[in-house]
């Protein structure tokens, strides 16, 4: 077995000695060794089978060699036990230990499948030549030497490959060694140089520290001086900008800085030497005051020349002036007052020029008399154009860009704009009021006054929408113009009615034809179309005009009836004349929506006069039929026209001397002679009433009342005289009077 221990065992024996079993720590790989190679069992069986065959062959062919080896082994065992036990035991342990370590390192080393496959392939090749290796002769010795040489070559090759892997590392380590030596020598030089320089740097550091401390003090002083100068003083250029520079963005920037300096100087008053703060504040205040006055002058100059507002840069600068002056109300109010005064004077002069020379080549006075509506319309149109133009101009002055001011400032300037517009336009209030009221006061035509009123109302609405804030200005003036027109209308109508009231010719118009007087027709023909065209009820808010239009004409013709020849007319004719006048008034005012309440009043008066005429007509029927005395007697006992009727109530009539059969027969004769033509007589007496409805109503009601009395009186006669003296029934009487249907419906 010298092929196994060729590198460790150097025995002088010819044959190898048997060795005891090795104790190998190969538990890890040996347990999984069979699982890695599925054909390990078959390989083992083949090897065992081959060994058996070899042993059999050797036992057959060479029994002598086997016997020799067996005897030799036994003798060696005995010698080992007896003679060399003490000497061989340590050496054997060493060999066993070395072999165990090698085998365990080999077997426990984790190998890949390919490496294991290669190992076992080499082992298989070795096992194939196992027979020649085990031969005891020269051939076996040569085979074993060959195997030993192959193993050595393999081992050398493997070791050489392993050493080749470390060769680059060794080369790098040698190069690194050179670099490390150079670095070590350089570091030693640096350390020596640093040690030499350290001593000299301490002196240098102390000097640098002193210089740095001085530099810090100088820098602090410089910063303090710079901060003081920036916070409490203005440089020469900034002072020049405030005193002599143009109004621009730079000017307002410097002005804001000057105001900030003025505020900051207040802290200087608290130091020991307060003169510095006082002088600084006085100088800065003087600069700020001059700059503010300069801003005010620029704003006044720009607002005084509206053509300059066409330049956007100038407008933007003006807006900056407004923003600056917003925090100084006395300056801003001064600018606005100057602007309002200038614009007010200009507008008043232009209006007076327009009013005095409106039409070239004609007399303004004559035109005002001929066509006052046109004159007032032109003046109001001119004023409206002035309002629109002035509103747009002032709105353009106070309209800021989106990013120039905040929302609060924009709202504040919007209020200032509306206030300026109101104040400027307020200057037109007095001249406009004087001129228009002068024209209205001279006008006496109702149609013209109504046209002026409508025109003034229209422009009042337009001015109210255009002017946001008025302060008793132009809008109030137009409103007063509307009121003046209303008052003038009422006064004119009242004067006209007064003239009619006192007119003798109007009284003479009441004649025997019982028709309404002509002045009523003329009056309503003039005034009602004007009322019909009125779309607002402001003119009727106090009902004075309505009362004059309806109530006073009624009062006037009633007064005329009392004072004229009509007072000698019969009562029926007076009532007919009243009905005709009221019917005419009703027909005139009914289409006018604003006179709806008066329509109800006139209807009530017509009903009142109609009832009087019905009573007159009933009295006439009773008188013609001889029933007047009996009618009075019955009504003295109990009113005959009540809905409740009982014959027993009228028993006291029997005590009256007139209630006799002879008198009743005479009444019956008169009735039979009168009633057949009574309807024609009634219609003839009411022929002069203009309204057929009123005539029909009077005839119907009077006939029904007469028929009702006749029927009830007939019952009284039948009850207490016991003889039917009245030939006709109440139904027949109603038929003769043409009201049978209405009478029976009432029953």
From Swiss-Prot:
**Can the keyword Membrane be found in this entry's annotation?**
yes
Where is the protein found, in the record's own terms? Answer: Golgi apparatus membrane
Q: Which InterPro entries match?
A: COG6 (IPR010490), COG6_C (IPR048369), COG6_N (IPR048368)
- In its keyword annotation, does this UniProt entry include Magnesium? no
**Keyword annotations of the record:** Golgi apparatus, Membrane, Protein transport, Transport
Q: What is its main location?
A: Golgi
Q: Which family does it belong to?
A: Belongs to the COG6 family.
Name-wise, this protein is: Conserved oligomeric Golgi complex subunit 6
Specify the species: Meyerozyma guilliermondii (strain ATCC 6260 / CBS 566 / DSM 6381 / JCM 1539 / NBRC 10279 / NRRL Y-324)
Q: What's the gene?
A: COG6
């Amino acid at each position: 077995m010298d092929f196994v221990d060729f590198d460790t065992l150097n025995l002088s024996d010819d044959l190898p000695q048997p060795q005891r079993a090795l104790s190998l720590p190969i538990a890890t790989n040996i347990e999984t060794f069979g699982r890695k190679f599925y054909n390990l069992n078959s390989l083992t069986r083949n090897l065992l089978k081959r060994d058996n065959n070899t042993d059999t062959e050797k036992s057959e062919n060479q029994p002598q060699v086997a016997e020799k080896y067996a005897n030799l082994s036994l003798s060696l065992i005995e010698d080992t036990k007896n003679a060399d036990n003490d000497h061989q035991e340590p050496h054997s342990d060493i060999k066993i230990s070395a072999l165990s370590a090698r085998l365990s390192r080999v077997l426990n080393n984790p190998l890949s499948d390919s490496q294991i496959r290669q190992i076992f392939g080499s082992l298989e090749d070795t096992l194939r030549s196992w027979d020649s290796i085990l031969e005891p002769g020269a051939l076996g010795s040569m085979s074993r030497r060959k195997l030993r040489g192959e193993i050595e070559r393999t081992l050398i090759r493997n070791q050489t490959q392993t050493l080749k892997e470390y060769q680059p590392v060794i080369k790098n380590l040698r190069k690194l060694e050179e670099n490390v030596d150079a670095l070590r020598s350089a570091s030693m030089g640096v350390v020596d140089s640093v040690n030499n320089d350290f001593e000299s740097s301490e002196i240098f550091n102390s000097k640098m520290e002193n210089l740095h401390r001085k530099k810090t003090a100088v820098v602090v002083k410089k910063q303090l001086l710079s901060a003081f100068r920036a916070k409490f003083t203005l440089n020469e250029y900034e002072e020049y900008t405030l005193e002599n520079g143009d109004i621009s963005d730079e000017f307002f920037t410097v002005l804001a800085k000057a105001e900030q300096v003025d505020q900051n100087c207040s802290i200087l008053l608290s130091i020991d030497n307060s003169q510095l703060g006082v002088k600084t504040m006085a100088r800065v205040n003087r600069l700020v005051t001059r700059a503010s006055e300069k801003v005010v002058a620029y704003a006044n100059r720009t607002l005084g020349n509206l053509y300059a507002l066409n330049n956007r840069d100038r407008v933007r600068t003006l807006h900056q002036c407004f923003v600056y002056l917003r925090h100084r109300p006395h300056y801003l109010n001064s600018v606005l007052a100057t602007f309002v005064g200038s614009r007010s004077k200009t507008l008043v002069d232009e209006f007076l020029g327009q009013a005095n020379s409106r039409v070239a080549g004609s007399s303004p006075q004559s035109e005002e008399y001929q066509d006052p509506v046109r004159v007032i319309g032109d003046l109001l149109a001119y004023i409206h154009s002035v309002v629109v133009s002035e509103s747009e101009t002032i709105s353009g002055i106070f309209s800021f860009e989106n990013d120039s001011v905040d929302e609060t400032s924009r709202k504040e300037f919007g209020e200032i704009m509306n206030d300026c517009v109101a104040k400027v336009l307020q200057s037109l209030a007095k001249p406009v009021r004087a001129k228009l009221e002068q024209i209205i006061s001279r006008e006496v035509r109702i149609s013209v006054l109504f046209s002026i009123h409508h025109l003034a109302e229209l422009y009042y609405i337009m001015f109210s929408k255009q002017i946001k804030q008025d302060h008793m200005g132009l809008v109030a003036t137009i409103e007063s113009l509307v009121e003046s027109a209303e008052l003038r209308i009422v006064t004119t109508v009242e004067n006209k009615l007064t003239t009619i009231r006192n007119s003798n010719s109007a009284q003479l118009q009441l004649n025997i034809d019982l028709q309404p007087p002509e002045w009523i027709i003329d009056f309503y023909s003039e005034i009602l179309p004007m009322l019909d065209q009125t779309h607002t009820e402001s003119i009727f808010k106090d009902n004075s005009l309505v009362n004059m239009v309806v109530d006073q004409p009624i009062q006037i013709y009633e007064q005329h009836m009392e004072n004229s020849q009509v007072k000698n007319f019969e009562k029926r004719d007076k009532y007919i004349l009243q009905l005709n006048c009221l019917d005419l008034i009703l027909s005139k005012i009914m289409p006018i929506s604003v006179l709806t309440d008066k329509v109800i009043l006139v209807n009530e008066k017509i009903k009142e006069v109609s009832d009087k005429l019905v009573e007159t007509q009933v009295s006439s029927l009773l008188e013609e039929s001889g029933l007047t005395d009996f009618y009075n007697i019955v009504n003295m006992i109990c009113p005959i026209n009540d809905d409740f009727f009982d014959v027993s109530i009228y028993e006291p009539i029997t005590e009256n001397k007139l209630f006799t059969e002879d008198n009743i027969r005479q009444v019956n004769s008169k009735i039979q002679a009168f009633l057949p033509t009574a309807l024609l007589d009634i219609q003839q007496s009411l022929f002069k009433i203009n309204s057929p409805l009123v005539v029909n109503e009077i005839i119907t009601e009077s006939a029904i009342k007469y028929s009702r009395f006749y029927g009830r009186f007939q019952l009284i006669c039948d009850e207490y005289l016991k003889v039917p003296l009245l030939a006709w029934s109440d139904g027949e009487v109603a038929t003769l009077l043409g009201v049978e249907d209405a009478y029976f419906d009432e029953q």
